[in-house]
């Protein structure tokens, strides 16, 4: 009998509880952090496919993006209270979030590289200096960019960065970078 009981408990452990509806699975996946999603890809081929598929990952990314944009807007609101000269010299700006990624850049020091960051996975990448930034290395005139556009090309799936100088732009046009 003890052997029979042991076999029975093994059977229970091996039972797979199937989630009846893929919509329910997607609703669960949407709320999970990226690290957990990575682990859950080993559960089954079906889960791996659901997590990696466009339909499975886009709601998750959309959810994370919404959450990230909200937190960034809160940071912007808090940053306005820092008005000392020291803080203005170190002013760090950031772009809107795209697929959980956003760019950090200096609004004052053009010699600092632009960084792309994914806070969920703790991934970051320093981008090569844009032409406008390289010009700032050579010129003593300070050329700043007033806007940094960050987006994703829906056809190719590549991320695009547009660096736009403020007027008067001294003949420098906007610059697009892909990565």
Curated annotation (Swiss-Prot):
SUPFAM superfamilies per the UniProt record, alphabetical: F-box domain
Superkingdom of this protein's organism: Eukaryota
Limits of the F-box domain: 19-55
Protein name: Probable F-box protein At3g25550
Organism whose genome encodes this protein: Arabidopsis thaliana
Taxonomic lineage of the native organism: Eukaryota, Viridiplantae, Streptophyta, Embryophyta, Tracheophyta
């Amino acid at each position: 009998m003890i052997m029979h009981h042991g076999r029975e408990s093994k059977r229970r452990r091996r039972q797979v509880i199937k989630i009846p509806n893929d919509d329910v699975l997607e609703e669960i996946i949407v709320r999970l952090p990226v690290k957990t999603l990575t682990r859950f890809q080993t559960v089954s081929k079906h889960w791996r496919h659901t997590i990696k598929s466009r339909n499975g990952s886009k709601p998750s990314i959309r959810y994370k993006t919404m959450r990230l944009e909200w937190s960034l807007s809160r940071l912007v609101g808090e940053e306005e209270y820092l008005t000392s000269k020291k803080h203005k010299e170190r002013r760090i700006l950031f772009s809107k979030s795209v697929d959980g990624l956003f760019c950090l850049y200096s609004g004052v020091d053009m010699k600092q590289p632009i960084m792309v960051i994914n806070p969920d996975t703790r991934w970051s990448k320093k981008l090569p200096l844009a032409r406008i930034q390289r010009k700032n290395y050579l010129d003593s005139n300070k050329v700043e960019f007033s806007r940094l556009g960050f987006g994703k090309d829906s056809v190719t799936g590549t991320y695009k960065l547009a660096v736009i100088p403020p007027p008067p732009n001294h003949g420098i046009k906007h610059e697009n970078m892909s990565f």
